[in-house]
A protein has these predicted regions:
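Short acidic/polar inter-strand loop motif in beta-rich domains
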Residues: 112-119, 513-524
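Beta-strand-rich binding/interaction modules
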Residues: 71-76, 427-428, 441-444, 448-512
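Extended, low-hydrophobicity, Ser/Thr/Pro/Gly-biased non-transmembrane segments
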Residues: 109-208
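Hydrophobic alpha-helical and helix-loop surface patches within well-folded domains
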Residues: 50, 192, 222-462
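Solvent-exposed alpha-helical segments and adjacent loops
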Residues: 527-693
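A surface-exposed beta-strand-loop module
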Residues: 67-128, 186, 493-505
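N-terminal, polar/Ser/Thr-rich
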Residues: 15-47, 71-73, 78, 130-134, ...
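Surface-exposed beta-strand/loop patches in extracellular or lumenal glycoproteins
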Residues: 49-69, 150-167, 413, 460-477, ...
Length: 693
């Protein structure tokens, strides 16, 4: 997850105050911050002295950004006081004639308070920022880039030297290389330096225990709270494996150190050369196997090679493909296929026409639909590129971009140029339809037929796609008892016919058997899931009348956790027959009158004080069931049921359901997931079976 967007938002208000020529990365401006901070956790504040060296540029005024809640005490230029105006987070400094020469050395002494409220748990992962830009407290400190905790020159990419003084035992950690921690006279100082320019600096502090391990020239460190220190060994070794993997695939690690830092509230952030994980997050079993590697991959893509946001954020999709998807691929081909299938299901269920946009307009995720586009669809674009141009051209092209654009902005166009050079083909139409056009194709198999012709079997049919058509090379697979044959069908326009000759009689024909092509699925291909509800445009949350007041709070919390766009909570007796046709439904508790409006899947039994899933009975008060079903009233609607057998763990479970987006049903006991699964898919317009002779 990138932290650059806040800086962009802050920047917008200052454009009018910039001198002609501007202070920007494009102008070649060189900026260095020598920043000294003193943290006062019990007062939620800091005191700062920032000495900024500007190597180039001629201007009569300077405008810098600082927290609106800050107080600027004095400003000097080359050791001499200068007049300034500080208002609404903008610091305007008036320069004199003899100041207008390089280097310009500017010192700003200031103080600021940061006390954003922090959550105890993840309410939702779709916008993981929680609104916490900055907090200084006795529990810990988190100050993110763009929060205004140091004076920022908009558009610059500075380097930093940071010295932080805090109460004894409180260590500060940020991007770059640690120059040491020292405790003296009841105070602990932490010193850091960045070697390469960055778009902003984030910083954390807390009572950390530090563990380090060297992997060739890279130091990996964990900054964990004492109660979590036992986890360091596994995290250090896993980080070493990921560093070795990406150095082999892409190129040298761009930084000198990588730090894994524990946060006192739930986060999952990746910054240049360090990741910040909440205390609850680092204990999750899948973090080391997936999320940690994802954040380390961002050191190459997003924090190493920077993103040109004006032309779309490519780095989330590329990182997803080179981390989450690659790890599945290394387990097995089937695991990777299932991962791609889930991308297609997520896109189809979460992205409504009104929410869709092209990848060239993706900046960062803010809801389930934007994640399905910017992470999922984007990952599929890189997958299709890899298949289309071949392994060598794909990996060498990535290495070329990394070498050419390290610590510079890159756009989709840069990837296109690199891949074209390696593959020796034009990719103009590919990028045009997949990056600059919203949506995805939807295609089906039409009139499949088979006939015997002398010693061969002739298979014919058509591929039909909806308007507007895509240029596709669709894989098809014909299977027989003795083996299978794969072919590719070029599709140009809304319909393409094909004919394939086989020496054996096939029993099955499948289009895109490995889910290698980005597409919109048909309803029959998508089992109802948590994501089906998250992608709904309108949900009625229905509670039994007798427990309405008791369960209304948990119902609202569940709706918020799922990031439902539009929902209404009503008692059961207000539900009308037409409502189920016009809305998706979330039942919090079984209906008091009649049966729920969905078909009960095989292996599932639901009662008010017990339920049975796959032959296992659940009847403890701490047991909870959540399931999503196809509506029995309207086949395009879904009905979900949340059935906690008591109120004890209902809130805790409601917070966790959103994390299981791909699943149809979930079982929890004492707040822990006990079982999960997906209803089977038995039909698809992309396969055809012939009966045996």
């Amino acid at each position: 997850m990138s932290r650059r967007m806040l800086s962009t938002l802050f920047l917008c208000g200052a454009i009018g105050l910039w001198p002609a020529g501007g202070l920007s990365a494009e102008s070649g401006l060189s900026v260095h911050h020598d920043l000294m901070l003193v943290l006062h956790p019990s007062e939620n504040k800091l005191s700062g002295l920032d000495t900024i060296t500007i190597e180039q540029g001629k201007f009569s005024t300077l405008t810098l950004l600082l927290s609106k809640g800050a107080t600027v005490h004095d400003v000097t230029v080359s050791g001499k006081s200068r007049a300034f105006v500080f208002k609404d987070g903008q610091l305007l400094i008036l320069l004199q004639n003899n100041d207008r020469k390089a280097p310009l050395i500017l010192s700003i002494r200031y103080s600021a308070s940061f006390h954003d409220p922090v959550p105890d748990t993840f309410a939702s992962t779709d916008n993981p920022g929680h609104g916490v830009a900055g907090i200084i407290s006795t529990q810990g400190t988190f100050l993110q880039a763009g929060a205004g905790w140091y004076p920022e020159i908009p558009g610059s990419r500075p380097t930093f030297h940071l010295l932080v003084e805090a109460p004894a035992g409180t260590l500060a950690v940020t991007s770059g290389r640690c120059l040491g921690h020292q405790t003296k006279n009841g105070r602990t100082s932490s010193e850091w330096a960045t070697q390469f320019p960055s778009e902003g600096l984030s910083m954390s502090a807390g009572p950390y225990t530090v563990r380090e391990k060297n992997f060739e020239s890279v130091t990996v460190a964990t900054y964990f709270f004492p109660e979590s220190a036992s986890l360091s060994h596994d995290y250090l070794n896993a980080a070493g494996r990921y560093l070795a993997l990406y150095q082999e695939l892409i190129g040298p690690y761009p930084f000198q150190q990588f730090s894994i830092v524990e946060n006192f509230f739930p986060t999952g952030y990746g910054f240049p050369s360090y990741t910040l994980l909440g205390s609850t997050v680092i204990r999750l079993p899948f973090i080391i196997e997936t999320s940690l590697g994802h954040e380390i991959a961002h050191c190459w893509w997003g924090n190493g090679v920077l993103v040109d946001y004006s032309h779309g954020n490519w780095c989330e999709g590329l990182t997803t493909y080179l981390a989450d998807h690659l790890y599945k691929e290394r387990i097995s081909d089937e695991e990777a296929r299932q991962y791609r299938l889930q991308i297609l299901r997520n896109f189809t269920t979460l992205v409504n026409p009104g929410d869709d946009f092209p990848l060239s307009q993706f900046r960062g995720r803010y809801d389930p639909a934007s994640q399905a586009i910017g992470y999922g669809k984007s990952a599929m674009v890189f997958h299709m590129l890899r298949i289309g141009i071949g392994e060598q051209a794909f990996w060498e092209g990535l290495k070329d971009v990394f070498r050419a654009k390290l610590f510079k902005e890159a756009s989709w166009k840069d990837f296109q140029i690199a891949f074209e050079a390696r593959a020796g083909v034009s990719l103009e139409s590919f990028f045009e339809q997949w990056v600059f056009r919203k949506g995805a194709p939807q295609f089906s198999l039409k009139n499949p037929a088979m006939k015997k012709q002398q010693a061969s079997w002739i298979i014919t049919g058509s591929i039909v796609q909806k308007e507007p058509p895509y240029d596709l090379d669709l894989p098809i697979r014909m299977s027989a008892a003795s083996g299978r044959r794969d072919s590719k069908i070029p599709v140009r326009g809304t319909e393409a016919t094909f004919q394939v000759s086989l020496q054996v009689r096939p029993s099955r024909l499948v289009v895109d058997p490995e889910c290698d092509v980005m597409r919109i699925l048909y309803p029959s291909e998508i089992p109802p899931s948590v994501n089906s509800l998250k992608g709904s445009s309108s949900v009625l949350v229905v509670l039994p009348k007798a427990s309405f007041s008791k369960r209304k709070q948990v119902a609202g919390f569940l709706a918020g956790s799922l990031s439902l766009k539009k929902f209404r909570i009503i008692p059961e007796d207000e539900l009308k027959a037409g409502d189920v046709k016009e809305n998706d439904v979330l039942l919090v508790g079984l209906p008091e009158n009649g049966s729920p409006p969905f078909k009960m899947p095989e292996g599932l039994t639901l009662q008010r004080h017990r339920f049975k899933v796959n032959e296992r009975d659940y009847d403890r008060p701490s047991d909870s069931f959540f399931g999503v079903f196809r509506s029995s009233v309207h086949e395009e609607r879904v009905v979900a049921l949340f059935q906690p057998l008591s109120e004890k763990h209902a809130d805790e479970v409601a917070r966790k359901i959103t994390h299981y987006g791909s699943y149809s049903y979930l079982v929890f006991r004492e707040g822990r997931n006990e079982a999960k699964g997906t209803w089977p898919v038995t039909e698809s317009p992309l396969f055809h079976e012939w009966e045996e002779e």
